[in-house]
């Protein structure tokens, strides 16, 4: 995803 927030509150940019 783009800009998806994860379970631990981290923002990913997969």
Swiss-Prot record:
Keyword Transmembrane: no
This protein's name: Endochitinase
Temperature dependence: Optimum temperature is 35 degrees Celsius.
Enzyme class, broadest EC rank: hydrolase
pH dependence, entry free text: Optimum pH is 7.
Catalyzed reaction equations: Random endo-hydrolysis of N-acetyl-beta-D-glucosaminide (1->4)-beta-linkages in chitin and chitodextrins
The keyword Nucleus is assigned to this record: no
Record's function text: Has endochitinase activity.
EC number: 3.2.1.14
Superkingdom of origin organism: Bacteria
GO molecular function, one term: endochitinase activity
Keywords, in A-Z order: Hydrolase
């Amino acid at each position: 995803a783009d800009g998806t927030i994860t379970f631990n509150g981290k923002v990913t940019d997969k």
